[in-house]
Regions:
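A composition-biased, non-transmembrane "mature-region" signal
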Residues: 4-6
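Cys/His-rich microdomains that often coordinate metals
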Residues: 19-24, 44-47
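Short linker/helix segments within small regulatory modules
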Residues: 26-37
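Short metal-binding segments enriched for Cys and/or His
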Residues: 41-61, 67-72
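Long, contiguous alpha-helical scaffold regions
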Residues: 70-132
Length: 132
């Protein structure tokens, strides 16, 4: 009997902040980046690094998307204070998270999910709508 591969043990990606299922990533409009991504209904943004080797670029892209495209603002955000993040191994063909190991895995894509933490002094607003 064949053992299941890591890919088959994956699970459909869900937002860790609201629990909703994440849509399939697609080409993001309004950005020159080729990295696919999308946005959750709660305002969290994610970008997929298909090679698993451009993590810094993917995280910066996700932060810029979360800031509405304001790259200057996104460069000064600090994890834990300004945003929450989740980095997970991802299979783009099956649209599944691949659990069971951490770190770089040759040929495995990575999904970078970011949600901004509202500042305590800011008025409570609804989720940021996706860019048009």
């Amino acid at each position: 009997m064949a053992m299941p591969t890591l890919r088959m043990r994956g699970e459909p990606p869900a937002c860790p902040f609201c629990g909703a299922g994440l849509p399939r990533p697609k080409r993001r409009e309004g950005t020159p980046s080729l990295l696919p991504g999308a946005r959750c209904a709660c305002g969290a943004c994610f970008v997929v690094d298909p090679t698993g080797r451009n993590g810094g670029d993917a995280l910066l892209e996700a932060l810029a998307d979360a800031c509405g495209g304001d790259r200057a603002r996104s460069n000064f955000l600090q994890p834990g204070r300004d945003y929450e993040e989740l980095i997970e191994n991802y299979d783009a063909q099956l649209h599944r998270w691949i659990k069971g190991f951490r770190g770089y895995r040759r040929g495995m894509a990575r999904l970078y999910l970011v949600r901004l933490i509202p500042s305590p002094g800011a008025a409570q607003q609804g989720p940021t709508p996706p860019p048009a």
